[in-house]
Design a protein with these regions (language model features):
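Long, intrinsically disordered, charge-dense linkers/tails
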Residues: 1-256
Length: 256
């Protein structure tokens, strides 16, 4: 059992769930067979999702962070994620409780099964070639994540405001034009209008990149952001080499 396993297992057992240790080469095939035999039984790894989503419930809580803050957190943390070969991260923020971990990494049960089956079953090599997809989940209830949001607002608001205002205006013009074109055939839309929409799309993309650059510059100076990312990577055995050495140095600096 590794650090990654033990922390997720502890969270599941604390929730009252029964956890099976299945780390053999044939276990994925056994699990699939059992799920086919017992239609109402489903197996899922303890690190495939946040603890509240492991077992599907009808009374699921819905405390999503507002879209604007979701975007800010995503831009900040995405800018500081290390580049890894054939590895991609999707960043989300969810209310997990103030006592839960501030950040965690999960990986879809479905994709992991497909990639594992690709290693032992002919005809599924397509899944084996796909990049590993991970979810970086930020706990919006945690003090550290709240502090990052508050500090970002203080440091970036003045620079972001004019860019966002221009983005809103560009988006309004784009929406108005597309609404005007609704119901028309492509050949009936004047070339000038098509060019204008393309121009607005390009302008919006440029402004979005500019705004993300502001968040990236802020994130690069915030040691807590990178520390949280590295803690999540370390927990999942994904922090190695120079990145691990930098994490150790930063940890020492933070506790001096």
């Amino acid at each position: 059992m590794c650090i990654r396993d033990s922390s997720y297992i502890e969270a599941a057992t604390n929730k009252g769930y029964n956890v099976l240790l299945m780390d053999g080469q044939l276990d994925i095939a056994v699990v699939s067979m059992l799920e086919q035999k017992f239609e109402k039984v489903r197996f899922t790894r303890v690190d495939s999702d946040i603890i509240d989503n492991l077992i599907v419930k009808e009374d699921k809580k819905n405390e999503a962070l507002e879209a604007g803050k979701q975007e800010v957190l995503s831009s900040i943390f995405k800018s500081q994620l290390p580049k890894m070969d054939k590895t991609e991260f999707n960043i989300t923020a969810q209310a997990l409780g103030e006592n839960a971990t501030p950040i965690m990494i999960t990986q879809s049960e479905y994709m992991r099964r497909m990639k594992e089956m690709a290693n032992i079953q002919a005809g599924m090599s397509f899944y084996g070639e796909m990049p590993d997809m991970f979810n970086l989940v930020l706990n919006s209830d945690h003090k550290l994540v709240k502090e990052v949001l508050a500090d970002e607002d203080k440091e970036c608001a003045a620079a972001v405001a004019p860019v966002q205002a221009e983005m809103d205006e560009v988006n309004k013009q784009r929406t108005d034009l597309k609404k005007k074109q609704e119901g028309k055939k492509d050949e009936d839309i004047p070339t000038a209008e098509k060019d204008k929409v393309n121009e607005l799309d390009k302008k919006w993309d440029e402004l979005k990149t500019q705004k993300e650059g502001i968040f990236a510059d802020y994130a690069a100076k915030n040691k807590v952001v990178r520390q949280l990312i590295d803690l999540a990577l370390l927990q999942n055995g994904m922090l190695k080499g120079e990145a691990l050495n930098n994490f150790v140095k930063r940890s020492i600096d933070l506790i001096k």
